[in-house]
């Protein structure tokens, strides 16, 4: 049962009884904020939806996406999630569900249909939810997961985009201000402000506006540069939890294999502690809002069992570190087509049979950033260009986001934006002339009853779901700086 609306008390999150509540769970990525690697399409969500509308027509388009949103999370999912001891589901959503760019500041009530449903399902099974605005008008970062069809995060340069986000969060706060199972509002996912100071200034502004409507719920605020950097953050806001994201390159195809060496374990802990310096310095709660490896494909990857065992060992060590410091965490992610989720679609399902050949093509062309596999033919084309740029324009290595090398910038603009969008219609064409029943079967591929579970991953999560008791000697990270250490490492 709920202990009332959660709040921040010192470095803890507590209920009305002042007893600590540690939130641990996963994110429902790919649902109300779709992502290419999660469900299989190329490019960005808005481009995917435009192509699907072109191919299906309005009636079939509306039917399919409503069924998709319905089947993606049902009571069966809530029961399973709760059975693993997990108590918090992060709910990423795209602003497009609530506002039309051609009719701004007019609330689309339809956006709450599925958000309300899942919040209520989670509450029924004693699961808190964190509402996460994952895609903002103009794009808060240059990546696909903000539904940004460019590599320019224009949100930071246009006050009107910022005004619209303040307006939207105020509307959301009106709806959920009395809901004790909503753990709070994650106002911006992975912001990337090249000037740094505008993000904390915007947080100061929106905090006042939201608090005027809902003075009780916690605000969950990501750091800058994909939730890894705290430059120009000079103070903390009341009743606020600050969030980092803690992915490790060792969990991805282009990273080194995790072998459990003392050096690798130290690297994992040091990486986390650097990102947590700001929270440690200010003695606030610590939330790791995203982390987790991707997994090799049994149908495509030789040695997949060994690879996946090492990836889960890596995850287990990260969770051990988080237990040591008794932090809140939300793994990325709950459900997908087989790359990263706790559960995933069955290769024999209608959806997977329809798109599997296209997934092989995407992988070969490196159209998805997440879980990008080596592709010699692509790299033979791209690498000489990258070397040429680095030789003649060495400043290219210093462009923001600073964790991106030149190769990442080039691949993003050529492969993952332009080439991927060129194939949006081809992907949508896979569903051309499907009947309503066939579209329903495709959408139902994501229903819990039709999905497969990643058993060892789920056992590891269950083992770490309950935080260590305070009496067991958990530690508070020590801060030796003001929390402003710069980020210079590569992202997955």
Stretch-by-stretch model annotation:
Residues 2-9, 15, 22, 26, ...:
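Active-site region of glycoside hydrolase catalytic domains
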Residues 6-7, 60-89, 99, 103-139, ...:
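An active-site-proximal structural segment forming one wall of the substrate-binding cleft
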Residues 24, 269-405, 409-423, 428-430:
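Substrate-binding cleft of secreted/luminal carbohydrate-active enzymes
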Residues 35-46, 105-110, 137-159, 237-239, ...:
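Aromatic- and acidic-residue-enriched segments that line the glycan-binding/catalytic groove
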Residues 48, 70, 104-111, 154-165, ...:
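Residue-level preference for long, well-ordered alpha-helices that form the structural scaffold
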Residues 61-63, 257-262, 302-303:
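Short, basic, glycine/proline-bearing loop/turn elements
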Residues 92-95, 133-141, 223-225, 332-339:
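Short, solvent-exposed turn/loop segments enriched in Gly/Ser/Thr/Pro and often Arg
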